[in-house]
From Swiss-Prot:
Active-site residues, as the UniProt record annotates them: R21, N39
UniProt catalytic activity: an acyl phosphate + H2O = a carboxylate + phosphate + H(+)
Keyword Hydrolase carried by entry: yes
PROSITE patterns registered for this protein in UniProt: ACYLPHOSPHATASE_1, ACYLPHOSPHATASE_2, ACYLPHOSPHATASE_3
Domain of life: Bacteria
Entry protein name: Acylphosphatase
Domain Acylphosphatase-like: 6-93
Family: Belongs to the acylphosphatase family.
InterPro entries, per database record: Acylphosphatase, Acylphosphatase-like_dom, Acylphosphatase-like_dom_sf, Acylphosphatase_CS
Single GO molecular function: acylphosphatase activity
Source organism of this protein record: Anaeromyxobacter sp. (strain Fw109-5)
Keyword entries, A-Z: Hydrolase
Pfam entry (one): Acylphosphatase
EC number per UniProt: 3.6.1.7
Length: 93
């Protein structure tokens, strides 16, 4: 059985106004990862993701690149225990 994990992700750089959230939703759903993504008032993008650890790690790697218009400066990840309480990946406001 695959290892399950949860990650809290903070992405900084030019990551707002470049369709980062919509692209993150597409990538997470493609990977089968559950959770959410939202803009933060300080200019970062925040996400909470859970699922098979390898798939969550793939989403974290994607966040390091982002969509074509993004210029990612840094990605901070805090790993936690899988909770099983997140819904289909979506944008939070």
């Amino acid at each position: 059985m695959a290892e399950l994990a949860r990650a809290h992700i903070l992405v900084s750089g030019e990551v707002q106004g470049v369709s980062f959230r919509a692209a993150a939703v597409d990538e997470a759903r493609r990977l089968g990862v559950r959770g959410w993504v939202r803009n933060v008032a300080d200019g970062r993008v925040e996400a909470e993701a859970e699922g098979e650890r390898a798939k969550v790690e793939a989403l974290v790697r994607w966040c390091g690149r982002g969509p074509p218009a993004a210029r990612v400066a840094d990605v901070q990840v805090s790993w936690g225990a899988y909770g099983g309480d997140l819904g289909p990946f979506s944008v939070r406001h």
